[in-house]
Amino acid sequence: MTIALGKFTKEEKDLFDIMDDWLRRDRFVFVGWSGLLLFPCAYFALGGWFTGTTFVTSWYTHGLASSYLEGCNFLTAAVSTPANSLAHSLLLLWGPEAQGDFTRWCQLGGLWTFVALHGAFGLIGFMLRQFELARSVQLRPYNAIAFSAPIAVFVSVFLIYPLGQSGWFFAPSFGVAAIFRFILFFQGFHNWTLNPFHMMGVAGVLGAALLCAIHGATVENTLFEDGDGANTFRAFNPTQAEETYSMVTANRFWSQIFGVAFSNKRWLHFFMLFVPVTGLWMSALGVVGLALNLRAYDFVSQEIRAAEDPEFETFYTKNILLNEGIRAWMAAQDQPHENLIFPEEVLPRGNAL
């Protein structure tokens, strides 16, 4: 047997170890390596949006007022996209367009690219934060996987779609009314509601809402009597070892209602994860298709018959005519640089004009 005598000396920590110890320390607000991406990007994205909606006009890019300073409110203010003439420029503050002039940069729409890019990386940082924390406490990464769905939608709508078009101009501006207008644009120019990917997205989101309502109600209905409190919350013991509700009772109830029911909690909760996430992923794929100007369903036979027979009309042909009206009205409004002129008789009429 060999005995080694001497003093054990631990190697000094290098810079990575020191940073790792500090970043992943147990504190009230976890930072982590993901925080190096999340916190600066979220700060700049939110700060840029608040700055733009408060002070910055869209007169030079869209011919619109879009800030609180100009009289907008929370629903009508927005950080607007750059002009179409700027195409896909990153609009860096020090770039050839603004040349370091902050006022000019804001007027050209630089805040939009600033908010969009920092927002995208901020969302990715938040997903990585969920990965990092899950790994630290030895959880599976399904929270992060689920959060990839809204990230996919954001990236496809705000970045990939305008990249497939002529410029950032055709992306949504960051504002409530601006997003509504973008939805109308999507319908008029892409017939988005008849796109199968949009249909899958609607089924996913509304189906998830239905599943949440059913699940929450079923759990409340089958709670074990675990206390003498007057309501659910006072009777709840956060350290209880037993189940909170009866899966067996819930299974029997829904078996009688529908004839089928979830047999175990794992499959039930996976299904609640699968439905909305898949729906949002499909929506994102559909928007990528729109970036390439792929068309939705076309029922040409109905259009031809409606054109030939004044007595034949379907909800589809009526919607196609509505889309033509949207295009005729929005194209001249939204793209003044194209100098589009439509005869008065093809434009929509109404006292709102």
UniProtKB/Swiss-Prot annotation:
Presence of the UniProt keyword Magnesium in the record: yes
Transmembrane region(s): 41-61, 125-141, 153-166, 208-228, 279-295
Residue sites binding a plastoquinone per the record: 215, 262
GO biological process, one term: photosynthetic electron transport in photosystem II
GO cellular component, one term: photosystem II
Catalysed reaction equations from the record: 2 a plastoquinone + 4 hnu + 2 H2O = 2 a plastoquinol + O2
Short name of one Pfam family: Photo_RC
Residues annotated to bind pheophytin a: 130, 143
Enzyme Commission numbers on file: 1.10.3.9
Main localisation: plastid
Residues annotated for chlorophyll a PD2 binding in this entry: 198
InterPro entries xref list: D1/D2, Photo_II_D1/D2_sf, Photo_RC_L/M, Photo_RC_L/M_CS, PSII_PsbD/D2
Phosphothreonine modifications at: 2
Entry keyword set: Acetylation, Chlorophyll, Chloroplast, Chromophore, Electron transport, Iron, Magnesium, Membrane, Metal-binding, Oxidoreductase, Phosphoprotein, Photosynthesis, Photosystem II, Plastid, Thylakoid, Transmembrane, Transmembrane helix, Transport
Any one GO molecular-function label of the UniProt entry: oxygen evolving activity
PANTHER family per the UniProt record, alphabetical: PHOTOSYSTEM II D2 PROTEIN, PHOTOSYSTEM II PROTEIN D1
Protein name (Swiss-Prot/TrEMBL): Photosystem II D2 protein
Organism, scientific name: Citrus sinensis (Sweet orange)
